[in-house]
Regions:
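Active-site bordering "gate/hinge" segments
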Residues: 1-278
Length: 278
């Protein structure tokens, strides 16, 4: 699928080195994302989109330069390499540190594919809809539930990396995230409760009961929702709080994770969320 990458490698390396770069690397990435949502067990939204692009990174006189664009072809790679070099030269006067990469062995022609059994993009739309609808209908059969919302998001990432030292790697990663929500509306107002399944590095097999027991969780959700509706408001005071792992991992990420992300620690933060993940 990345058949032009050999020619792309040659052109971006030649162009960047000729322009003065000591380090050059390229990333070619294709990300396909699918999304399906149901409201009260009926289809509401469905999307299937693919993003495909290339990024070239260089070091010139101790300063980083970067350029990227959608699509991939030989002339574009050459143009991006030259643009990245110019970006490095432009940012050099503002650089506070001289960037020098540590020695690293080369890893030519390496491949890695995440473990999964069923590519979600090979599963028919009707099968995906039927699974979400089945779980939704089980909730709707309870008198505690007035409405349901269900969605699944599935992604396939394919990334190729190469640098001037001979490393070339291809990787593919698949992941799925699904959430089913039960909603109660009445004199009490509006209350909801959702499944706790985390985003997972699985294929569509994640939607069976082998890796996550969806049926059992759906079966107990109406009872938990009814208890939530009947629960009194919290009175001011001191309490022991039990935090479920599905909430705690976000707490850890927001408090400790962001502070220890590499780009933030060494002053390379690109935006609010940074470009690395902890």
């Amino acid at each position: 699928e990345l058949g032009t990458r050999g020619s792309v490698e040659i052109r971006y390396k030649e162009a960047a080195k000729a322009a003065g770069a000591l380090h050059v690397d390229v990333r070619i990435e294709r990300t396909r994302s699918g999304y399906l949502s149901l409201r009260d067990a009926k289809p509401e939204t469905q999307t299937d989109e693919t993003n495909f692009g290339i990024g070239v990174r260089v070091i010139v006189n101790g300063a980083w330069g970067f350029a990227s664009a959608p699509g991939v072809n030989v002339e574009l790679a050459k143009k991006l390499a030259i643009t990245a070099v110019e970006m490095a030269k432009t940012s050099k006067p503002l650089s506070t540190d001289f960037v020098s990469l540590a020695p690293e062995p080369s890893y030519p022609n390496q491949k890695w594919v995440s473990a999964y059994e069923i590519d979600p993009f090979t599963v028919s739309d009707s099968e995906k809809k039927d699974r979400l609808a089945s779980l939704s209908n089980k909730l709707l059969s309870s008198k505690s539930v007035n409405h349901t919302s269900a969605h699944t998001h599935f992604v396939k990432e394919q990334k190729y990396y190469a640098d001037i030292y001979g490393t070339s790697t291809t990787q593919q990663r698949v992941r799925v995230q699904t959430q089913i929500e039960a909603i109660s509306i009445g004199e009490h107002g509006f209350e909801s409760m959702r499944t706790l399944a985390q985003p997972a590095g699985f294929g569509w097999e994640w939607m069976g009961n082998k890796n996550w027991d969806w049926d059992s969780e759906i079966a107990e959700l109406p009872t938990l929702l009814a208890e939530k509706v009947a629960a009194p408001s919290v009175e001011p005071g001191r309490y022991d709080v039990l935090v479920h792992p599905s909430n705690l991992w976000l707490t850890i990420h927001e408090s400790i994770g962001h502070a220890t992300e590499l780009d933030r620690a060494i002053g390379y933060e690109a935006n609010y969320a940074g470009t690395s993940f902890a």
